[in-house]
Design a protein with these regions (language model features):
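Residue-level preference for short helical/loop micro-motifs built around acidic side chains
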Residues: 12-13, 40, 61
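Helix-turn-helix
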Residues: 1-13
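Alpha-helical DNA-contacting segments of helix-turn-helix folds
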Residues: 15-22
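Short linear capping/connector segments at secondary-structure termini
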Residues: 61-70, 145-146
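Hydrophobic alpha-helical connector segments
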Residues: 17, 28-55, 70-73
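C-terminal peripheral helix-coil segments that are non-catalytic and often amphipathic
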Residues: 44, 79, 83, 87-95, ...
Protein backbone atom coordinates (compact mmCIF):
# COMPACT_ATOMS: atom_id res chain seq x y z
CA UNK A 1 0.00 0.00 0.00
CA UNK A 2 2.83 2.39 0.81
CA UNK A 3 4.26 1.86 -2.68
CA UNK A 4 0.97 2.96 -4.22
CA UNK A 5 0.92 6.17 -2.24
CA UNK A 6 4.52 6.94 -3.16
CA UNK A 7 3.54 6.76 -6.84
CA UNK A 8 0.10 8.38 -6.59
CA UNK A 9 -0.94 11.37 -4.51
CA UNK A 10 -4.31 9.79 -3.78
CA UNK A 11 -7.01 7.41 -4.90
CA UNK A 12 -8.18 9.73 -7.71
CA UNK A 13 -4.71 9.76 -9.27
CA UNK A 14 -4.49 5.98 -9.04
CA UNK A 15 -7.90 5.58 -10.71
CA UNK A 16 -6.93 8.07 -13.42
CA UNK A 17 -3.78 6.04 -14.13
CA UNK A 18 -5.77 2.79 -14.33
CA UNK A 19 -8.34 4.39 -16.63
CA UNK A 20 -5.61 5.86 -18.84
CA UNK A 21 -3.85 2.48 -19.07
CA UNK A 22 -7.07 0.90 -20.31
CA UNK A 23 -7.53 3.69 -22.86
CA UNK A 24 -3.96 3.15 -24.05
CA UNK A 25 -4.71 -0.55 -24.57
CA UNK A 26 -7.89 0.07 -26.57
CA UNK A 27 -6.11 2.67 -28.72
CA UNK A 28 -3.22 0.30 -29.39
CA UNK A 29 -5.69 -2.42 -30.33
CA UNK A 30 -7.16 -0.16 -33.03
CA UNK A 31 -3.76 0.01 -34.70
CA UNK A 32 -2.96 -3.69 -34.35
CA UNK A 33 -6.34 -5.25 -35.16
CA UNK A 34 -6.51 -7.75 -37.98
CA UNK A 35 -9.35 -9.02 -40.11
CA UNK A 36 -10.28 -10.16 -43.60
CA UNK A 37 -11.85 -6.85 -44.59
CA UNK A 38 -12.10 -3.28 -43.33
CA UNK A 39 -15.55 -4.04 -41.87
CA UNK A 40 -14.18 -7.16 -40.15
CA UNK A 41 -11.36 -5.10 -38.61
CA UNK A 42 -13.80 -2.42 -37.45
CA UNK A 43 -16.16 -5.02 -35.99
CA UNK A 44 -13.33 -6.87 -34.23
CA UNK A 45 -12.14 -3.61 -32.69
CA UNK A 46 -15.68 -2.65 -31.65
CA UNK A 47 -15.92 -5.99 -29.83
CA UNK A 48 -12.72 -5.06 -27.97
CA UNK A 49 -14.07 -1.57 -27.29
CA UNK A 50 -17.24 -3.16 -25.91
CA UNK A 51 -15.18 -5.30 -23.53
CA UNK A 52 -13.19 -2.21 -22.56
CA UNK A 53 -16.43 -0.29 -21.94
CA UNK A 54 -17.90 -3.05 -19.82
CA UNK A 55 -14.73 -3.34 -17.71
CA UNK A 56 -14.02 0.39 -17.40
CA UNK A 57 -17.54 1.04 -16.15
CA UNK A 58 -16.42 0.14 -12.63
CA UNK A 59 -13.24 2.22 -12.74
CA UNK A 60 -15.07 5.17 -14.31
CA UNK A 61 -17.85 5.12 -11.72
CA UNK A 62 -15.35 4.96 -8.89
CA UNK A 63 -13.30 7.74 -10.49
CA UNK A 64 -16.48 9.85 -10.69
CA UNK A 65 -16.81 9.47 -6.91
CA UNK A 66 -13.53 11.39 -6.61
CA UNK A 67 -13.99 13.86 -9.48
CA UNK A 68 -16.62 14.81 -12.07
CA UNK A 69 -17.23 14.43 -15.80
CA UNK A 70 -15.36 17.65 -16.51
CA UNK A 71 -12.10 15.92 -15.51
CA UNK A 72 -9.83 16.15 -18.57
CA UNK A 73 -9.02 12.43 -18.31
CA UNK A 74 -12.48 11.70 -19.75
CA UNK A 75 -12.45 14.18 -22.64
CA UNK A 76 -8.82 13.49 -23.53
CA UNK A 77 -9.42 9.74 -23.46
CA UNK A 78 -12.46 10.01 -25.72
CA UNK A 79 -10.51 12.16 -28.19
CA UNK A 80 -7.69 9.59 -28.25
CA UNK A 81 -10.07 6.67 -28.80
CA UNK A 82 -11.80 8.53 -31.63
CA UNK A 83 -8.48 9.37 -33.27
CA UNK A 84 -7.32 5.75 -33.00
CA UNK A 85 -10.54 4.22 -34.35
CA UNK A 86 -11.40 6.72 -37.08
CA UNK A 87 -9.13 5.05 -39.70
CA UNK A 88 -10.99 1.76 -39.13
CA UNK A 89 -14.37 3.36 -39.81
CA UNK A 90 -13.12 5.40 -42.77
CA UNK A 91 -11.62 2.29 -44.37
CA UNK A 92 -14.85 0.33 -43.90
CA UNK A 93 -16.93 3.21 -45.26
CA UNK A 94 -14.60 3.71 -48.23
CA UNK A 95 -14.94 0.00 -49.00
CA UNK A 96 -18.72 0.51 -48.84
CA UNK A 97 -18.97 -2.18 -46.18
CA UNK A 98 -20.65 -0.08 -43.48
CA UNK A 99 -23.16 2.74 -43.40
CA UNK A 100 -21.95 6.23 -44.14
CA UNK A 101 -24.72 8.02 -42.23
CA UNK A 102 -23.31 7.23 -38.78
CA UNK A 103 -20.34 9.01 -37.27
CA UNK A 104 -17.73 7.26 -35.19
CA UNK A 105 -18.96 9.19 -32.18
CA UNK A 106 -22.49 7.82 -32.69
CA UNK A 107 -21.17 4.29 -33.09
CA UNK A 108 -19.05 4.52 -29.94
CA UNK A 109 -22.02 5.94 -28.01
CA UNK A 110 -24.12 2.94 -29.13
CA UNK A 111 -21.42 0.52 -27.99
CA UNK A 112 -21.04 2.35 -24.65
CA UNK A 113 -24.82 2.16 -24.14
CA UNK A 114 -24.81 -1.59 -24.76
CA UNK A 115 -21.76 -2.02 -22.49
CA UNK A 116 -23.70 -0.31 -19.69
CA UNK A 117 -26.30 -3.09 -19.72
CA UNK A 118 -25.79 -5.43 -16.79
CA UNK A 119 -25.71 -9.09 -17.62
CA UNK A 120 -23.60 -12.05 -18.56
CA UNK A 121 -22.04 -12.29 -22.05
CA UNK A 122 -24.81 -14.69 -23.06
CA UNK A 123 -27.28 -11.89 -22.41
CA UNK A 124 -25.36 -8.87 -23.71
CA UNK A 125 -23.64 -10.62 -26.64
CA UNK A 126 -26.74 -10.84 -28.86
CA UNK A 127 -27.57 -7.21 -28.07
CA UNK A 128 -24.07 -6.18 -29.14
CA UNK A 129 -24.29 -8.29 -32.30
CA UNK A 130 -27.63 -6.72 -33.24
CA UNK A 131 -26.07 -3.29 -32.77
CA UNK A 132 -23.10 -4.23 -34.96
CA UNK A 133 -25.41 -5.72 -37.60
CA UNK A 134 -27.00 -2.28 -37.80
CA UNK A 135 -23.72 -0.87 -39.13
CA UNK A 136 -24.17 -2.67 -42.43
CA UNK A 137 -25.35 -0.53 -45.29
CA UNK A 138 -29.16 -0.52 -45.66
CA UNK A 139 -28.97 -2.20 -49.11
CA UNK A 140 -26.83 -4.98 -47.61
CA UNK A 141 -29.31 -5.50 -44.78
CA UNK A 142 -32.24 -5.73 -47.20
CA UNK A 143 -30.52 -8.29 -49.39
CA UNK A 144 -29.39 -10.32 -46.38
CA UNK A 145 -32.93 -10.42 -45.02
CA UNK A 146 -34.42 -10.87 -48.48
Amino acid sequence: MATLYRNFAGRRELLEALYTDEVNAVCSAAEAISGESPAARLTAWLHQFFAFGASKRHIASELLEHTDRSNPVFSESRARVIAAARPLLVAAQNAQEVREDLTLEQILDMIIAVAAIHGEPGYTGPILQTTLDGLRRPADVGSAMG
